[in-house]
Amino acid sequence: MNQKLLTPWKPTKAQLLAAHNKRVPDLVAKDLIVLFAGINPGLYTAAIGRHFGRPGNRFWPALYAGGFTPRLFSPFESDLLLDLKLGITNVVDRATARADELTNDELRAGGKRLEAKVKLWAPTVVAFVGIGPYRIVSGIKDARVGLQKNRFGGSHAWVLPNPSGLNAHYQPAALAQLFGDLRVWATAQHKRRQKKRPIS
């Protein structure tokens, strides 16, 4: 991979303002172990074009602490996730300054688009990064963190807390445990899935 593409950089105020409604390309491939689905990109993330890109977002540290990555990746190294059979997408594509700028109707519409994507890509698990949007998308108002009873787009559904630094309900140790629980379960499920496939 081009090392220049991995070099972190900070967007200017003008670039942040211009990032409104921008989209960040999905990081996907078929047959992933886990496809992480964020709520929608923030302005910083959209400006740099990398998922969970804002400094202070705890997604990347939680991913490492949970055992998904061999070391702490920066957002600029996100493409390396595909080698680990991990991907990232969003419920709503457009960037906003705050997630609460999205309406429930917009989240539901985004959920339908996401469901179509999941059916196409067929990850073993789709992990929603944020319980509030999952409750709206699924219509399950009492959904809790962890494995869900209902599948989503044919894949197992799992809910993780929002790793934003603004979410004080979950500290790094708790996030590490929850991400680790997902990794153990999803990896085992993926292996079982592989064994069931016919040999071509």
What positions do the PLM features span?
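C-terminal capping/extension of enzyme domains
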Residues: M1-P25, A29-K30, P55, R98-L114, ...
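Short amphipathic alpha-helices and their capping/turn segments at secondary-structure boundaries
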Residues: R23-A29, L72-L81, K117
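Short, hydrophobic/glycine-enriched beta-strand segments
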Residues: V28, I33-I39
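Short, solvent-exposed loop/turn segments at secondary-structure junctions
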Residues: N40-Y44, D93-T96, G132-Y134, S164-L166
